[in-house]
Amino acid sequence: MNTFGRELRITTFGESHGRAIGVVIDGVPAGLPLTEEDIRKELDRRMFCHIHWLNPRCEPEEFEILSGVKDGHTQGTPIAIVIWNKKAISSYYDELWMKPRPGHADLAYYLKYGKFYDHRGGGRASGRTTAAIVAAGAVAKKLLALVGAEVAGHIVELGGVEVKRPYTFEDVKKSWEKPLPVVDDDALAAMLEVLRKNAAEGDSVGGGVEIWAVGVPQGLGEPHFGKIRADLAHAAFSVPAVVALDWGAGRQLAKMRGSEANDPIVVKGGKPGLETNKIGGVLGGITIGEPLYFRVWLKPTPSVRKPQRTVDLAKMEPATLQFKGRYDVSVVPKALVALEAMTAITLADHLLRAGVIRRDRPLKDPVV
Amino acid sequence: MNTFGRELRITTFGESHGRAIGVVIDGVPAGLPLTEEDIRKELDRRMFCHIHWLNPRCEPEEFEILSGVKDGHTQGTPIAIVIWNKKAISSYYDELWMKPRPGHADLAYYLKYGKFYDHRGGGRASGRTTAAIVAAGAVAKKLLALVGAEVAGHIVELGGVEVKRPYTFEDVKKSWEKPLPVVDDDALAAMLEVLRKNAAEGDSVGGGVEIWAVGVPQGLGEPHFGKIRADLAHAAFSVPAVVALDWGAGRQLAKMRGSEANDPIVVKGGKPGLETNKIGGVLGGITIGEPLYFRVWLKPTPSVRKPQRTVDLAKMEPATLQFKGRYDVSVVPKALVALEAMTAITLADHLLRAGVIRRDRPLKDPVV
Amino acid sequence: MNTFGRELRITTFGESHGRAIGVVIDGVPAGLPLTEEDIRKELDRRMFCHIHWLNPRCEPEEFEILSGVKDGHTQGTPIAIVIWNKKAISSYYDELWMKPRPGHADLAYYLKYGKFYDHRGGGRASGRTTAAIVAAGAVAKKLLALVGAEVAGHIVELGGVEVKRPYTFEDVKKSWEKPLPVVDDDALAAMLEVLRKNAAEGDSVGGGVEIWAVGVPQGLGEPHFGKIRADLAHAAFSVPAVVALDWGAGRQLAKMRGSEANDPIVVKGGKPGLETNKIGGVLGGITIGEPLYFRVWLKPTPSVRKPQRTVDLAKMEPATLQFKGRYDVSVVPKALVALEAMTAITLADHLLRAGVIRRDRPLKDPVV
Amino acid sequence: MNTFGRELRITTFGESHGRAIGVVIDGVPAGLPLTEEDIRKELDRRMFCHIHWLNPRCEPEEFEILSGVKDGHTQGTPIAIVIWNKKAISSYYDELWMKPRPGHADLAYYLKYGKFYDHRGGGRASGRTTAAIVAAGAVAKKLLALVGAEVAGHIVELGGVEVKRPYTFEDVKKSWEKPLPVVDDDALAAMLEVLRKNAAEGDSVGGGVEIWAVGVPQGLGEPHFGKIRADLAHAAFSVPAVVALDWGAGRQLAKMRGSEANDPIVVKGGKPGLETNKIGGVLGGITIGEPLYFRVWLKPTPSVRKPQRTVDLAKMEPATLQFKGRYDVSVVPKALVALEAMTAITLADHLLRAGVIRRDRPLKDPVV
């Protein structure tokens, strides 16, 4: 449905051109410092307003925390966040009614929800709804910080341009100072060029991102159906446009022999660890204290300005569609921030499931 | 934990060298024809006993249905299936105690469960435990058959050998008449050669499989967190050794432009459908009546006979490990059957979630 | 946590004196007629504004539907409803800070949430939060109406005054035309007298209500942990101040012999049914097509104006507390509406779980 | 369905006259001492074999732990327990086929499962299936012991005979040395007399039990839908034949005024606590460190030897039924043990949900 997680549970709602979108975040213990600024920071990261030609009318989100926070701390009760929709120009979408856009959710919604769904701006299927996920991710990241864990991602492929040079987690985090989070400046320049070209031609591009989670404690996850890998795959494929995922070295591992693929176990600082980390920090579904990383691949934005073949559902006959509304040349940058958020939410959920963070008492209580 | 699904729910248990493994299947309506033969057929498919050199001591599973079935039909109550473990030679594993095998779950289990876990034969992390999933999959496949849906998979890559020629879903199903389910005879021959070579050298290989689900009705899945893609990704990554997944055309979609990636919508038999199906039958997380397909990539079996570097956890110093027990040269064939099962379970769960199959009354009741 | 239900799922949020309370209702199929008026009607029923001396400053709730509804129908997506909190006078509560009110949740919240919780107006534990449940109940009642089922309750005891004369379900529904829903006019007069007396003396009273669900189809519920009785008990005890529940004839059944307690099975209109219905319409946890009914007992409002003994948590020494804010002389009337709502939500959830209402397609779609 | 709990999860299966009944217990951390003897002790308590005339052919259960336990400790993996059904004489039940027993689940099962369910011995609805719950309760009690909490219950009413004298929790525990756990010897004698009389007359009686949970830490439970009271109500009503529940002083509270009902808050050993405990240890759904207690009322066994009116479902005409099989004169003693188990399971689940017991590492690991 629209709820994700077991002990940290987020419930999202809202359509793109409706009154608002939002999220209820449940399971956060009392006493976590949390301000509107924490939420705003992540919502702003998602917007990439600084690339003006990419988002010509970019504006910061307007949101409110309706519950669960008092005096800069969580109360232990559900945190409801509403992100108000701006006055949108929906007339672009009038032509699309009953003419499902190829590659978009329109056809599926028509079959499942009939004439009742709000198709304007993509409605419930709009990438815009990931803003609610990103707001929840801001809270999850603060929970992770309690145990010294952090999540960050970057773009590794865009419009066919791939990042090829080696990098560290520090490089990943620093890449956010650039126009797009790309560790390799040459690749970044080429990517921006591809984006400009596609914007000019009314087309779109896909790409790939890599998410890292560092400092995640050992012992999270379970052998069969609570595997960290499986829960994060679920999380990642919940983000619109995701079409593939490689865990750790991913598909390359499938081409290796066992003697190559296995990461030797070594003593590190008096504790057992991996010499290499091709497996991405998880063995048998359980974290071992090594960094987690995985790559996620996204298809191009389905909305393009080129004419496309579709069906007029009222007449049930072929039709041509030309989209005239706003669209993102690539969903990759925004999806990256949503994927960071989903990763943080999933891992914070596991911290609570495993009891690493307790909830029978406040996180800190100077009164007691 | 060890339960998967919402309305069709499977709960698995058991360690590789313990008394038994098994599964409880909950949510099946009364009146579904089900016999031991249905279960046995799937358990046999998983074993590939016919490739003698691959499974030198291959024997069919011994199992019992303990509840939920009477006179060849389901009762509507939980179906418990126990698969008895055979007298296993665990002495191979004595040396491994406190010497975690690289690439295996040992190290993670040691960190999470301490000295309490049963490491013999891989314990709870053993690929053997997927037999319980396969038994549950047999039931799920019968539920899918009620609406005319079927699931089948095949091997598309093994030890670096790839299937390259085109094929149909009929080819996929017919490939099960061959020693391994590979649609391309040349590729099959090369794969068998690679397997033999690695068996001789005490090494292992990974590969990839493709799962198809055909006849799945429209309207299953939900826009945000009950996406069919996300639930199937969760399902697939629950199978041991899975490291990557491509939905539909997968990573290739990420390299296309929107105008190429979108599948045109056309009229098919008086209804809207896709001209091509690069997206794998799901739009916005919801089925549209087109076939679903995805590829899953598996790493090589971590157990190999070559010496490997590990740590002696008792002394916390480097150690060398040489595994002498039985192992599968590749997990790919067995995992394929488990992936078919997980796919069938996930989709049957969605049939129940959406109410396509009702549960307030028996499937058929000549009495009424 | 703050989510209830499996296929119809409500998630509530909000503190009494915070910005707003609200609810997200998930799982409703597309095409259910739903207007603000439907919600308002139930919110108004909960307020009993017509008894002026009971609610001196009674005002209708201000609420908004933020998502999931378009043109008077549900979209199939989550329905978020926000009920704005009015400018509340919180100064009454300043004295209560660190002086937990006996009988209220204050002490428990202090222990679990420390200084971080919002104690004003009872915060998250306030009876006010049941308005969100009542809003969700309005939607659930409309789902029940699809299959001809309806839920209604009445007061059977208040301040020690009991309803003793026999009545029908029609009487129960008609009792809502009176100041309080009580089928017996003499009892009603006595109850109003008791309420007035306690209001004057600054004390409060408890009581009991009975909930009926008529027209519920057969075959809902499951034998072990999805029992209708157990799910409704869970639902009922989720409403604040509930301290006891009698299912059907309840505790009286415990005093009978088997030969008296069993309801004879008879042919009714060509189908098997019960001659009497002491068991309250459920056998073995499953509905049989007979009316469901149960009684729920509520303790008196803990907030009273009489001085009470408590502890000053800052000094950890005895203290006396005198509450000066507004309080309800009895929670029974409002809780009754909340219990109707929880009953409707639980039963509508079971209609979806069992597939009686489908969700792979809209409820009605003239387009198709 | 047949799964109960969130972080401690039990899944039961089995029909009374099928091959076996059983339970899978999931979520127990590694390192909990657990032997067959722990399970057997609780299964034996449920049987009351020492009252020979009550259970003429009483025999201890035969069971096996199939997984999750090694060398006297839990492994952290699911614990599957199978309780084998004995060779039962099912011929008693032949006459009952298509003639539903009044008061039993037969009619409901016929409507929901049609001719497919196993009616022999009550099938899935048999009280016998609570043995699986009791086995799981044995494990939950050991988890509670980790934090110093314990659960025990006693009979407070049977066949109309009530316990009236005051007692302590020690009295409750000591009452288990008697033939039936009744704190008052006079009441016990009268109850045994009533049981004998009803056994002789082929009738049955109901009654009431009280469950105590002492030593439960503060801060468990949540304000809205994870209320301890609501979860325990759900737990209690999951036991067959339960028809009413009083939490704490229960219905008596509903007759008091607020000034009487509220328990004064006092300083106890330097901490805040309750002077009296009419509310049963829970405020606002959350534990406060005081003992929990509640009473549960059970209807008489529906199976009696007296002739009863029913319907022949094949002919759809009135019929008379005379049951000739074995039956329990009262379900109260066995249900008491099941209710203790459900209470322990629910509270242990909350210990895990709140993170009081962690699961990222073993409970104790001398190796580390």
Curated annotation (Swiss-Prot), chains A, B, C, D:
Q: Which domain of life is it from?
A: Archaea
The cofactor required is:
FMNH2
Pathway recorded for this protein: Metabolic intermediate biosynthesis; chorismate biosynthesis; chorismate from D-erythrose 4-phosphate and phosphoenolpyruvate: step 7/7
Please share the entry's free-text remark on the cofactor. Answer: Reduced FMN (FMNH(2)).
Binding locations of NADP(+): R46
Where in this chain does the entry annotate a coiled-coil region? none
Enumerate the UniProt keywords alphabetically: Amino-acid biosynthesis, Aromatic amino acid biosynthesis, FAD, Flavoprotein, FMN, Lyase, NADP
Does Heme show up as a keyword for this record?
Answer: no
Membrane-spanning residues where?
none
Per the UniProt entry, the Enzyme Commission number(s) are 4.2.3.5
User: Known InterPro entries for this protein?
Assistant: Chorismate_synth, Chorismate_synth_AroC_sf, Chorismate_synthase_CS
- Gene3D superfamilies in UniProt: Chorismate synthase AroC
Sorted alphabetically, the Gene Ontology cellular component annotations on this record are: cytosol
Q: What does this protein do?
A: This reaction introduces a second double bond into the aromatic ring system.
Can you name this protein? Chorismate synthase
Source organism per entry reads Pyrobaculum arsenaticum (strain DSM 13514 / JCM 11321 / PZ6)
Report the gene name: aroC
